[in-house]
Amino acid sequence: MTTQTVSGRRYFTKAWLMEQKSLIALLVLIAIVSTLSPNFFTINNLFNILQQTSVNAIMAVGMTLVILTSGIDLSVGSLLALTGAVAASIVGIEVNALVAVAAALALGAAIGAVTGVIVAKGRVQAFIATLVMMLLLRGVTMVYTNGSPVNTGFTENADLFGWFGIGRPLGVPTPVWIMGIVFLAAWYMLHHTRLGRYIYALGGNEAATRLSGINDNKIKIIAYSLCGLLASLAGIIEVARLSSAQPTAGTGYELDAIAAVVLGGTSLAGGKGRIVGTLIGALILGFLNNGLNLLGVSSYYQMIVKAVVILLAVLVDNKKQ
């Protein structure tokens, strides 16, 4: 038996269940872990999960924009490390924390734009272009930091910067507020602006998009620039939380971001996907990591479990396609 709305949309059909598979998986995961661990479903732990998820979730938003255009960005983890180190060094010399944040965001957006130019204007495959950028940015980070952590210090200015990572406005961690704002902004952009429509159109059919008069290169560059901007924002949050920037920070983060996008139902072929799905995908990874930790599962087995979950998500998506 199905339920039908005024608009005629049917619920609890096979098609509807396939659309909501990510949300259903998240709810099932929460139910299972809550049953196995009494410490899981508590306010403090939920805030802890959201705070830990925020970095990956914010990066995943940028990754979603790029993947929707039929691209991919493997450099976001290295970009996070570099921009985080730049922000930490600026704060460390007692320049205003807000200037450090602005500089890191501008650098991230600029590097993302350069990547976009290489992909769009240079006609280099996104995988190759971003792989090269990943190695380049990691090397630059090592040179910039001399392979050592960069501390923000213990001044009032450092405390202001730290607010972005450990502040709790109205009792809610600052990273959670930032994550919510980023997702709302991305949702509005994708569904209520011309840029959002162009991003979907470009991923759906690049040739047709170009023939319709849309500047496809410009859209790609904007998507990669936004991806870089959000990676740097994630880097700011991570450095603010730890009070230092590690030269190896962000290693493997690009894979977690891609996993969140895939778990959320966005097609790696581009043109299809929802930003809400990406949020759900990031939450699935966050709840899964936290639940396995509470259950005392070894980190080695955790990688296997995550791999199986992601593989199942891809198989389900392929079946849907």
Label the predicted regions:
Residues 22-35, 63-64, 134-140, 178-189, ...:
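Hydrophobic core segments of alpha-helical transmembrane domains in multi-pass membrane transport
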Residues 1-60, 94-99, 172, 214:
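Membrane-interfacial amphipathic/re-entrant helices at transmembrane-helix boundaries
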Residues 126-193, 219-222, 241-250:
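Transmembrane helix-bundle core of multi-pass membrane transporters
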Residues 1-31, 184, 204, 211-218, ...:
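Cytosolic-side transmembrane-helix boundaries in multi-pass membrane proteins
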Residues 225, 231, 241-307:
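Transmembrane alpha-helical segments in multi-pass inner-membrane proteins
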Residues 95-134, 280-281:
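Alpha-helical transmembrane segments within multi-pass membrane transporters and channels
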Residues 31-93, 117-124, 265-275, 308, ...:
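Single transmembrane alpha-helix segments in multi-pass membrane proteins
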Residues 184-225:
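Membrane-helix/interface signature in polytopic inner-membrane proteins
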